[in-house]
């Protein structure tokens, strides 16, 4: 059966069953549910449109919204699935969640009893040959196709498969050859010609029940000869279709073709209108085509908020999930954060793609050098990474009123990007100097925060968005010295004395009066030696001394500096009358 005809200007798109839509889009694609809280990122919307960024407004502010309408549709010409969303920008009071777990994840409504068994295959030149057949992987034949009757020779059956538009196709499934293999023969060439499939495209076979089979298509993008992508006219859905001036359909009309550049599916006018309406607080609509290498630009608020509450630093090991080509499983790739800020490019200072990752397998992820914080997860806790840098705790800062600015657990979350009120003053640049960071942070790359406001954006007018607690403006902190960053006792009394972990804690008495002269003795192991830390504190800066196991003492200035990345060539030793008899280690 031939699929229904469609014209390039047809906007009567057919809604697709959500389970079939998600199977065609891929398991890694996340579409928030109706009435959920989301953030709209204009940068991602622009990336889905065209590379001519200069024609669009350079907005870098994420817009908090509520989804008021969702349509899961399929392109009438290419069979590619896409989502049409209507978003309503929200104010701070309207956007605050009623029940929100800071590190929780919003999974939406998933019906376990309505899942689809899926298998996708990238077409080989033989599969895409007009007169050839389709070689069916054994896993697909066993898990998606109905079982063959192997009592007959050769085992053969007829399959009736429904495409994304509801058209039914029939294929002959046979098990033959030397060695024997599963093949689709009769009916396959007709399907290839009708769908204009080429080698590199993917077909997705889906089984929803014992007698319901579906087939979908994923197009492979092909760059133009000049490396760019020009735009072909059309509506906001069919924005990259054109009509051939040479090839004709059977009825004599111009043959419809489409670009495979990966861009141009959306018009610049539609994207510009959406960005302008969003900035004015008006409802706006967006169209999203899920595709490999493109990030969702309408993201669940819970995912963004939990990821932006993390204190991302260079050297952090992360992992990212990616769907395999056959959609059979999710593969996790690991890497190390090399940069947490975009110094160049059109989105400089924006949280969009702010993390630069050095992957363990760069040849596989060579086109995924920058990702969004919500696309990755911490691969392991700091104590599991065997890194020379100790785990740094989040600091508690005094408010101007004398109390502490804290979250639910009593600790302030450093606002990673500047998504807060413009009324907040800039933090003092001195608090970001190398000398005032804990020793484990001295190896991290720092930036000139003199022109960096608390929202993380460059310039003097930070956006009036992202006003949740974890994105609240910092108070006027002044200078933070090593008085606030002293070595404390290990978090557990049962910690092994041979542990190589160096524990760092923030000062718990940042404001108020200190007690009388006191002495603390703690120990850490550094470069194979046990170091005893003695602290004398009175009303004022703490005086610390580092004592080795043999009783000798290393003098320390008020601003303690420890470089954990390289052992010092020599450590001067001074006698300590308070220590016991010394011995050679």
Curated annotation (Swiss-Prot):
Organism taxonomic ancestry? Eukaryota, Viridiplantae, Streptophyta, Embryophyta, Tracheophyta
Subcellular localization, per the record?
Answer: Nucleus
Sorted alphabetically, the keyword list is:
Auxin signaling pathway, DNA-binding, Nucleus, Transcription, Transcription regulation
Identify the InterPro entries for this entry.
ARF_dom (IPR010525), ARF_plant (IPR044835), B3_DNA-bd (IPR003340), DNA-bd_pseudobarrel_sf (IPR015300)
- Name of this protein: Auxin response factor 17
The Swiss-Prot or TrEMBL record marks DNA binding at 119-221
Function, in words:
Auxin response factors (ARFs) are transcriptional factors that bind specifically to the DNA sequence 5'-TGTCTC-3' found in the auxin-responsive promoter elements (AuxREs). Could act as transcriptional activator or repressor. Formation of heterodimers with Aux/IAA proteins may alter their ability to modulate early auxin response genes expression.
Q: Which GO terms describe its molecular function?
A: cis-regulatory region sequence-specific DNA binding; DNA-binding transcription factor activity; double-stranded DNA binding
Return the annotated region ranges for Disordered: 483-517, 535-585
List all Low complexity biased stretches: 488-510
Cite the record's note on assembly.
Homo and heterodimers.
- Indicate yes or no for the key word Nucleus: yes
